[in-house]
Every structure is written in structure tokens, then in C-alpha cells.
């Protein structure tokens, strides 16, 4: 949780900087860096190898950890290089997302709507408290009501998110190294969220959009369905208090489905149906976006140009929002669930 992360940060940073420590670039200590690097020498190398069949002759002092310690013998470089060549290992490619331009752009102080196409509006706002940082947060939403009335569509959205996240792991890692983040969310449609340095966010978005139309193989799709079914089953064994919010939503919000309904829909899911659903969302959704931080209007319009190469925004669709149950006086809603763990929980 956020509170736990702040408590952990107190072990490493002064109290007054536990919140902004990841974003501060002052106080660089070249001597301290050189001292640390001087300790990273081959003589201090420790290599851990863990398996169930290793002989052991020692135990850890405070934990159960049988182990043994051996000196590392210098390898035969010729044989080692031959093994590397056989495995086809290569150095990673150059990270093309590393920021190069840290200039600050003129962003509006108030929320400013920008109409980029018919029925497509993006909102732009500069940061008040961090206006001197070359960073920003942007989110693009493709909104559809398909999952509000159909469990099968809800399942396809979950599978889309799972497959996209898996396929885009290398890109997300590259972005993280470059000081940015990339994530996809699926609810009433899908959303792409980018945050961090704004210099190379257009390049990151372009590559993220290239993989938006996920084209899994039959094997990859089957594995995604299996992960979803396993997740549904595992959720039943979570601590009961963690289930309160989903179960409350099941009672009070449109577009929420029981585990049985989701499992049944997942069992019926097909690759052909999934591809049809993806095409439907990309071609009929309501599109909107928000940009907060170091952006200007040209950046916003540039994002839509990239987006329009993959997504066809509907000129008539509206933002899909889940209906919420309106309480009635003297009416009580009751939901009981048996849990497969020796625990109980109550929310009222």
C-alpha cells in the first residue's frame, strides 16, 4: 500500500523527502558513486545457484537455509565463449526511449479541452506544483458498453489486457529503464496510460499502439484463458476482506458478473470471437484522453494522429459508464458467500 511504501522510504530518505525522493535530481555525490563502483570488483563476486539436488554442509543462523560455499574456479574462456555462441546470446539493443530533450513546454494552467476530431476530445492541463519538471501523465480511453451487458465481452476484455501485457513486457521494461511507464487497463473498454519523461513518449506510444491489435496464436490464447480461469478460482481462496469490494460491486454496479458466469464465458471463449471483439472495440468506441504535465497542444494533436492509424473513433458513441444501484428506503440487500478458507468476513 501507499502507506507501507512511505514507511519503507523512511529507512532510506530524510522524512521531508519520502514523497518526492524518486523525483529529485539534486545532491549528486560523485565521490560516493566512485566509492561504490570501486567495490564492484571480481574479487567480491558471489554467485548463487539454487536447486533441490545441491549438497550442503552449512545452515543459516536465523532461517532454514541449508547451503554450501565453494570457491569459484576461473573458467576456460575459450569453452565459455563457445557455450555463449551456441546459445545465441546477444547484447541488448540500444534503448531508443532514453530522454534527450528536457525542455519545459508552455502548458495551460487550467483544464483545456482540445477537439481533435468529431466526437473526440482530449483535455490538457499543466502541473501547478511540478511545472518545472519535464514529465507528464497521459491516458487514452477507448470506451465501449459491450462489457456492461455481456459477460463474454467482459472476459474478452480481460484476455485482451492479459495478452497485451505479456507481449509488451519488453517494451514496458525498456520504458521503465528510460524513466517512463506504460500500462493497459480494461474495464468499460480499454485505456493506455503513459507517465514519466515526455521527450520520448510519442515514440513509446507509437510502439505501444503497434501491438494494440493483439494477434495471439491458438496456444497463446489458450494459455490466457487458463490464466483467467486459474485467477477466478484463486480469488475464492483470498482473504475474505479482499473480496468485499468486488462483491459489493456485484450487488450495486452494472457490468459486474459472478465467478460462475465469468468462468462459463471463459470456457466458451474462442480465438475467432476474440479477434472479432478486438476489431469491434477498435472500430466503434468512444475515444477521449487526458494529458497532465509537460505537454502542449501540438503534443496532444500528435497523439491523435498516431492513434488514428490504429483506432477508428466513432462519431456517435458516448462514454460508457456503469449504472449504480439507487438505494431505496427500508430496502436491504443481502449477499452471503461460502468461502473455502477457514476465515470469515463481514461488510455492512
Residue ranges and their predicted role:
Residues 31-37, 110-111, 125-129, 179-181, ...:
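Generic recognition of flexible, low-complexity loop/linker segments
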